[in-house]
Amino acid sequence: VSPSGDLVIGYGAESSIFAIDASNPLNNSKLEWSGEEIFQDGDFHPGGLSALVVGNDGAAVRVAMSNFSVSSVEGGFYFGQTELLSISWNGDGSWAYIGGESGLIWRARWLEEGPDIHQMDGLGGSDVNSIECLAKWNICLVVTSFDGIGVINSDHELNWLGGVGYPWVGVACPIINGNTCVAVSSDKNVAMIEVNPYDPSVSGIGIVSLPDLEGQFNGLSFQSEGRSLISMTPFSLIEHSISMGESYPWIENSDAIEFDSEMADGRIVGSWPTSENSGWVMTSFGGFVHFSPKEDVDDSKGILGIWIIIVAVGGVTLMSLSALASSSTTISSWVTRKIGNEEEKKRDARNRRKKSKKQ
């Protein structure tokens, strides 16, 4: 997602790269690029003028926002035939960190005199599945298949924080401010990383397990400050609140199966916000799911709904559904506090006061 939030770059197999309107994904265009790459990850430069996309066999391309042209980056030979899995620009855009299979990480920048690319020291041996940099500081987090979670400081030093043995698949850091990041593992663990901006090597990490959930985590992204969305396989979505340290269901797989079994067979590959409580999810089939608060839910139910609209790339609307939040009173109360109207919030506050008096 671009720094301005109005453009999304999508990528995947067969060298496919799409420019997508963040507010209306039906407005999209496939960019011209010939090749056989499978692109795995991409990131916008903080300046917003270009994006880097990386993939298998050391593939690395630059997408220019001025004319949406795609070109190979200089110095790509440094990566050899490594499968590149992750990329992130640091806070001020001075360096990009690129992670690959077998624990390899490079720091890279492109100067007038040519590429400046270096393999980093202190590496692990397992795949670097995700890299995420904080917006405010030149500090980045690294998550791996079994070497744990690492942090890169402004001097390009990699230190390992913990979480060894967990199959970490994704990490997300605040979009604007804050220094608390969230990482997830495929076996349903959530790590909260409190980044120390003055000495990143002593950053704190806490891990909680969510064994009762069905399926596996496959990634996450920030929805708004303090809130991230965790995608799961089979197709489902939960929210994790940093301030509360808890997770809540948004879209359950049973809802997806009931309304569209083909969608339920797909995988969530990414999401982005359009406001605090709304946004889009992109699926592995090239479709999009729009979610936003439902305005006309019967107040007597005491819970809110999320409107879901499914569209296909270049296609038409396939379906719409209302996925109600869980009937759990705890979750219903939390959802009401988050996105309820004023009357619902007042009613919820009264109910919570009554409950506290009984305890």
Model feature map: region roles:
Residues 1-355:
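Residue-level hotspots at or immediately adjacent to binding/recognition sites across diverse folds
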